[in-house]
Amino acid sequence: MKFKLHVNSARQYKDLWNMSDDKPFLCTAPGCGQRFTNEDHLAVHKHKHEMTLKFGPARNDSVIVADQTPTPTRFLKNCEEVGLFNELASPFENEFKKASEDDIKKMPLDLSPLATPIIRSKIEEPSVVETTHQDSPLPHPESTTSDEKEVPLAQTAQPTSAIVRPASLQVPNVLLTSSDSSVIIQQAVPSPTSSTVITQAPSSNRPIVPVPGPFPLLLHLPNGQTMPVAIPASITSSNVHVPAAVPLVRPVTMVPSVPGIPGPSSPQPVQSEAKMRLKAALTQQHPPVTNGDTVKGHGSGLVRTQSEESRPQSLQQPATSTTETPASPAHTTPQTQSTSGRRRRAANEDPDEKRRKFLERNRAAASRCRQKRKVWVQSLEKKAEDLSSLNGQLQSEVTLLRNEVAQLKQLLLAHKDCPVTAMQKKSGYHTADKDDSSEDISVPSSPHTEAIQHSSVSTSNGVSSTSKAEAVATSVLTQMADQSTEPALSQIVMAPSSQSQPSGS
């Protein structure tokens, strides 16, 4: 029994030794004891170990995995979250703000040369001033329009609410009306900005008394501070005009902002360049009234004041300023109203609507491009068909001409032993051309007769006669091509034969 165990162990040891000799390369991975004959096999095996998937712990069925498939909708949503569709801020906005602040800081606060309008002595009701703002191309952070102030009068106890905007350093003209008593104060300055303030008061024929004291104002600075400014009440070199009647019921005027003085901030956001171009085109199509023009209606009392010079391309507000009575609605311009409505709609569009319109325009452009390409391809196909038909006609014509040439060659070869050729050989008409085997064709000047002269080389073999016949056939074809427009072929007469035939007879 012990002997058998010893033999078995010896055999196993021998097998292991032989195996280790045959496959000396052992895999060092944990749990794997495979051996390989060469190092390449071992490297491939180790690579399999490295590429083995490592699964984590078993997941429960209750766990819901969020779908992260990158669909177009999710892509657009991510773009919106990141802010790719937001309009970029203008790089010059901060510079404009800084420049306006610097101009405000450098502006002198002594406004003594300024003049103030004349206010009536006794007023039954407070005067009301309605102003609408017209944007300037420059961004203005705050408003410098002063609050309503109580103006001390000489013989009155009721206040007057007035809104005054310092647009320049002078008030050149003051227009006063006695009938229907409307005070129109219009600033017409040569600077590129102008301002108009229309003040309405009830009917009164009281005398006009200037304000004895200074006119107080509050100037709002961009940093939030409020600074009181005193303006003297004396008016220097002002022209006072008293027309017959200028009825004004609801005056509305535009108060454009002045460069260097921040005006009322625009309620609308900064618009994109495309919107600005669109609005510029609309403004050019409907040009507004020029600055300083006051149109007075004969029966309706329509007054329009426009300050267009203040902004060459102000694109965020309607361009016209109209003051009219309710009794004259026919003077309103529907074209201007529709233009302003379109601008408001363009300003209030949401990004989804913009994107939808953009996609619609892209689809329309793509369809137009496809239609143009289709028309172009159809024209090319038609041209190719025409060229192929023309090519077929030319090929058929070439085939007919080749058949005709072959028939004529056969006819000439059949008449190679003609007695006319024999007579020509005997006469020795072309003795000089025997060496070069050439041919000469002589056409008489007579319109009714043609003479075809053949030249041949008198050789003993038949090969030379065959080549001679082919040369003669070529010459005849050339002759026929030259005289295809002439009448039917006339009698063929050889020049030497006409002289040698009587002698032979």
From Swiss-Prot:
Chain positions found as N6-acetyllysine: 357, 374
Broad class of where this protein is predominantly found: nucleus
A GO MF label: DNA-binding transcription activator activity, RNA polymerase II-specific
Domain bZIP: residue ranges: 352-415
Motif Nuclear export signal 1 (N-NES) per record, residues: 1-7
Protein localization: Nucleus; Cytoplasm; Mitochondrion outer membrane
Keywords: Acetylation, Activator, Cytoplasm, DNA damage, DNA-binding, Membrane, Metal-binding, Mitochondrion, Mitochondrion outer membrane, Nucleus, Phosphoprotein, Transcription, Transcription regulation, Zinc, Zinc-finger
Extent of Polar residues compositional bias: 282-293, 443-454
Positions annotated as zinc finger (C2H2-type): 25-49
Gene3D superfamilies: 1.20.5.170, Classic Zinc Finger
Bias-annotated ranges (Low complexity): 318-334, 455-467
Modified how: Phosphorylation of Thr-69 by MAPK14 and MAPK11, and at Thr-71 by MAPK1/ERK2, MAPK3/ERK1, MAPK11, MAPK12 and MAPK14 in response to external stimulus like insulin causes increased transcriptional activity. Phosphorylated by PLK3 following hyperosmotic stress. Also phosphorylated and activated by JNK and CaMK4. ATM-mediated phosphorylation at Ser-490 and Ser-498 stimulates its function in DNA damage response. Phosphorylation at Ser-62, Thr-73 and Ser-121 activates its transcriptional activity. Phosphorylation at Thr-69 or Thr-71 enhances acetylation of histones H2B and H4.
Motif Nuclear export signal 2 (C-NES) boundaries: 405-414
Residues recorded with modification Phosphoserine: 62, 90, 112, 121, 136, 328, 340, 367, 442, 446, 490, 498
Chain intervals for the UniProt region annotation (Leucine-zipper): 380-408
Region (Basic motif): 354-374
Biological process according to GO: abducens nucleus development; adipose tissue development; apoptotic process involved in development; BMP signaling pathway; brainstem development; cellular response to anisomycin; cellular response to leucine starvation; cellular response to oxidative stress
Record text on subunit structure and interactions: Binds DNA as a dimer and can form a homodimer in the absence of DNA. Can form a heterodimer with JUN. Heterodimerization is essential for its transcriptional activity. Interacts with SMAD3 and SMAD4. Binds through its N-terminal region to UTF1 which acts as a coactivator of ATF2 transcriptional activity. Interacts with the HK1/VDAC1 complex. Interacts with NBN, MRE11, XPO1, KAT5 and CUL3.
Domain notes: The nuclear export signal 1 (N-NES) negatively regulates its nuclear localization and transcriptional activity.
Function: Transcriptional activator which regulates the transcription of various genes, including those involved in anti-apoptosis, cell growth, and DNA damage response. Dependent on its binding partner, binds to CRE (cAMP response element) consensus sequences (5'-TGACGTCA-3') or to AP-1 (activator protein 1) consensus sequences (5'-TGACTCA-3'). In the nucleus, contributes to global transcription and the DNA damage response, in addition to specific transcriptional activities that are related to cell development, proliferation and death.
Family: Belongs to the bZIP family. ATF subfamily.
Protein name: Cyclic AMP-dependent transcription factor ATF-2
Organism: Homo sapiens
Lineage, highest ranks first: Eukaryota, Metazoa, Chordata, Craniata, Vertebrata
Gene behind the chain: ATF2
